[in-house]
């Protein structure tokens, strides 16, 4: 029986390939749709309407208009780290009360 972590890994792979389709990469439009559907809270909290464009620029290291799986994982990892930092701060504040 797969562990929770194995399910999480499978979810990341399936999500990437669902939005990439038959390709082995995400286009800017693929990334925009993925972000809107899978990270709606993140985009809603962005004050910059060009947030997806900036994320694409950061992730597209080859400057070919494509984001591969490794770069996608970097995005997920970065968002997870930011969420964890927020979580830890809130847990510490709750502990002080």
UniProtKB/Swiss-Prot annotation:
The modification N6-acetyllysine is found at residues 23, 28, 54, 57. GO terms for molecular function: calcium ion binding; protein homodimerization activity; transmembrane transporter binding. Coiled coil: none annotated. SUPFAM superfamilies: EF-hand. Residues 47-82 form the EF-hand domain. One of its GO terms (cellular component) is AnxA2-p11 complex. Residues 60-71 are annotated as: Ancestral calcium site. Gene3D superfamilies: EF-hand. InterPro entries: EF-hand-dom_pair (IPR011992), EF_hand_dom (IPR002048), S100/CaBP7/8-like_CS (IPR001751), S100_Ca-bd_sub (IPR013787). GO terms for biological process: membrane raft assembly; mRNA transcription by RNA polymerase II; positive regulation of exocytosis; positive regulation of focal adhesion assembly; positive regulation of plasma membrane repair; positive regulation of plasminogen activation; positive regulation of stress fiber assembly; positive regulation of substrate adhesion-dependent cell spreading. Keywords: Acetylation, Repeat. It comes from the Eukaryota. Does not appear to bind calcium. Contains 2 ancestral calcium site related to EF-hand domains that have lost their ability to bind calcium. Heterotetramer containing 2 light chains of S100A10/p11 and 2 heavy chains of ANXA2/p36. Interacts with SCN10A. Interacts with TASOR. Because S100A10 induces the dimerization of ANXA2/p36, it may function as a regulator of protein phosphorylation in that the ANXA2 monomer is the preferred target (in vitro) of tyrosine-specific kinase. This is Protein S100-A10. It comes from Mus musculus (Mouse). The gene is S100a10.
């Amino acid at each position: 029986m797969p562990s929770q972590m194995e399910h999480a890994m499978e979810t990341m792979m399936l999500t990437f390939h669902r939005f990439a389709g038959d390709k082995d990469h995400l286009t800017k439009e693929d990334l925009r749709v993925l972000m809107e559907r899978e990270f709606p809270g993140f985009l809603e909290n962005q004050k910059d309407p060009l947030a997806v464009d900036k994320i694409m620029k950061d992730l597209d290291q080859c400057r070919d208009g494509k984001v591969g799986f490794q770069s996608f994982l970097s995005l997920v990892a970065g968002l997870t780290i930011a969420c964890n930092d927020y979580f830890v701060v809130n847990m510490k504040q709750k502990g002080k009360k």
